[in-house]
């Protein structure tokens, strides 16, 4: 069978292509998670409720019923394995659990490229000493991780290995199969392409690309390569752009060093503000004009920012003053939640022997409980009389103001550590943290804080606050199941837990039916907006990642000479970010 590649210049053209799929035929559409909503909308707009067309991701297509590790679960496992191997690690022995997240990302990258620990061991013979030691450490942890998975677990990478079998059982046979909007294809995903070629009625890829400097065309080349390995030829068809002249001029010249030919623009307006807040004020006035003068709804407007997380405070201030409802499409890491910081602060006190700064932060948290005046009184006492390691454990000194209040708060602080020691199993730590959350009524405090934020009109912040306890309990349950019997020092378990909390990102449900969409100019995928405003477009957009991976670009180049093919390199990731901005 031969395959078709349709190269489209924009997400809008991609959605339009899906809207033209023939009705009455069995269509199976695979796309990246960030594009599923746009793909489903495109199919539904064209065909109504399209029972004959299924839009899915690889993970959703494989379905449930399996013991699948979440990303944070994998981080917990890798961190626990690294901690248990600390005496054998050459490069990462000092803080084995400290980079569990990056170590898991490296293992996932290796698995996606079908690189085994044995291949890493073979590559060590031709590597320099530093790279050889690094590969030895990664291989050790990688083997331990694979041994863990062999007990009946699947992780995000392992799920893809089931794709060919799932295609045979799950409806690919006789269907028109489309691979839509992928930025690249891994060697694992290539097995899915091979299976589709052997089972489907037709196989096509609808991918974003073009001849302009904006595009990497990485996915197009990958798809052609993997089809050729499966014995199939590909035919490329370029879909022309349907953008208005101004937008088309931008598309053709974005990131092109040649200065563009001036174009008369009625639909594009430029404004240069003095600072970020000035730009957002201008954006707010434009939005109000679009809604009040042109009759648009707020949901017809999209605001794309260079750094949505960094602009969060200014955005809340400006849009709050103008009364503009908005939904920020930004995932927030659980590690930044105040309750997560309270839990990690508990571990810091335990592992660092009640350092004064840790004691001050722990007592100062709203989750410590009690009225604020009493907490401030106790914090001032600790600063004046107990500003040394272990000072918070000591009895309240005679002559201190309000000794009864101080003694009650000291007792409350010490009660949080009943039964705790600096070295315990993961399961014991998890049970102690659950006890802490219950004893200090953290659920009740969280509800009060969420209600207060709601009362101030900060709906997104309120929604984020309300998600803390349930998410932390979920991570604790995973930690107990995955590393409950492993004995660790408090700082090791805290480090692994912190990495897992960082890996768990919280997506917020829109709090308004009619709201401006606010997203990342390099990440968001939205093609239904009637007015698009881009702000914060400094020379830092798109953000360029630094080469901080455990296996650097230089290492990847060296491994490729040793017949170990690993990707992507950081420059390839940065090139994809440029394409996403366009």
Positions of predicted regions on the chain:
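Conserved coupling segment at the C-terminus of the helicase ATP-binding
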Residues: 129-130, 134, 141, 209-213, ...
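Short gly/pro/ser/thr-enriched loop/turn and capping motifs at secondary-structure boundaries
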Residues: 62, 212-214, 333-336
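Short loop/turn segments at strand-loop or loop-helix junctions that form parts
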Residues: 58-61, 205-210, 535-537
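Conserved RecA-like helicase ATPase core segment
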Residues: 189-273
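Anion-coordinating catalytic cores for phosphoryl-, nucleotidyl-, and glycosidic chemistry
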Residues: 2-55, 66-67, 193-194, 242-582
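Basic/charged alpha-beta structural segments of nucleotide/phosphate-handling enzymes
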Residues: 34-40, 44-172, 187, 221-223, ...
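Glycine-centered loop/turn motif at secondary-structure junctions
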Residues: 152-153, 200, 231, 294-295, ...
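ASCE RecA-like P-loop NTPase motor cores
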Residues: 1-27, 68, 72-83, 143-206, ...
């Amino acid at each position: 069978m031969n395959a078709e590649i349709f190269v489209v210049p924009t997400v809008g053209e991609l959605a339009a292509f899906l809207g033209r799929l023939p009705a009455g035929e069995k269509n199976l559409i695979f796309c990246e998670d960030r594009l599923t909503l746009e793909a489903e909308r495109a199919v539904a707009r064209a065909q109504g409720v399209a029972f004959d067309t299924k839009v899915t991701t690889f993970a959703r297509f494989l379905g449930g019923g399996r013991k699948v590790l979440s990303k944070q679960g994998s981080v917990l496992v890798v961190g626990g394995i690294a901690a248990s191997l600390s005496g054998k690690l050459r490069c990462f022995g000092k803080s084995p659990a400290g980079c569990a997240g990056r170590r898991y990302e490296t293992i996932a990258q290796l698995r996606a490229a079908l690189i085994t620990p044995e291949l890493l061991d073979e590559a060590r013979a031709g590597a320099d000493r530093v790279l050889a030691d690094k590969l030895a450490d990664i291989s050790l942890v990688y083997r331990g991780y694979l041994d863990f998975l062999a007990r009946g677990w699947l992780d995000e990478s392992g799920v893809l290995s089931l794709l060919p079998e799932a295609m045979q059982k799950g409806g690919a046979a006789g269907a028109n199969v489309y691979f839509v909007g992928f930025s690249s294809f891994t060697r694992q995903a290539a097995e899915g392409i091979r299976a589709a070629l052997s089972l489907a009625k037709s196989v096509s890829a609808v991918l974003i690309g073009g001849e302009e400097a904006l595009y990497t065309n990485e996915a197009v080349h990958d798809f052609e390569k993997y089809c050729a390995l499966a014995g199939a030829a590909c035919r490329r068809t370029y879909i022309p752009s349907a953008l208005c002249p101004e937008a088309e001029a931008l598309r053709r010249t974005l990131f092109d060093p040649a200065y563009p030919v001036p174009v008369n623009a009625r639909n594009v307006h430029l404004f240069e503000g003095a600072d970020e807040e000035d730009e957002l004020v201008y954006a707010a006035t434009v939005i109000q004009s679009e809604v009040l003068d042109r009759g648009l709804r707020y949901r017809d407007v999209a605001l794309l920012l260079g750094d949505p997380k960094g602009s969060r405070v200014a955005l809340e201030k400006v849009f709050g003053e103008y009364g503009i409802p908005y939904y920020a499409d930004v995932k927030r890491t659980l590690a930044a939640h105040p309750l997560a910081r309270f839990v990690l602060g508990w571990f810091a006190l335990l592992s660092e022997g009640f350092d004064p700064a840790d004691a001050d932060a722990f007592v100062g948290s709203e989750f410590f409980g009690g009225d604020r005046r009493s907490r401030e009184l106790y914090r001032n006492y600790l600063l004046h009389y107990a500003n040394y390691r272990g000072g918070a454990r000591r009895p309240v000194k005679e002559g201190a103001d309000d000794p009864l209040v101080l003694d009650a708060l000291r007792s409350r602080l010490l009660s949080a550590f009943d039964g705790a020691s600096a070295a315990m199993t993961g399961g014991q730590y998890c049970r102690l943290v659950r006890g802490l959350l219950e004893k200090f009524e953290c659920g009740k405090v969280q509800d009060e804080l969420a209600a207060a934020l709601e009362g101030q009109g900060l709906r997104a912040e309120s929604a984020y606050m309300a998600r803390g306890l349930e998410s932390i309990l979920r991570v604790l349950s995973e930690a107990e199941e995955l590393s409950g019997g492993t004995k660790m020092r408090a700082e090791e378990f805290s480090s692994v837990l912190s990495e897992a909390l960082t890996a768990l990102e919280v997506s917020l449900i829109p709090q308004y039916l009619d709201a401006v969409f606010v997203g990342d100019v390099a990440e968001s995928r939205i093609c239904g907006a009637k007015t698009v405003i881009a702000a914060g477009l400094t020379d830092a957009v798109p953000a360029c990642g630094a080469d901080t991976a455990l296996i650097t670009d230089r290492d990847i180049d060296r491994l490729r000479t040793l017949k170990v093919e690993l990707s992507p390199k950081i420059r390839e990731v940065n090139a994809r970010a440029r394409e996403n901005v366009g």
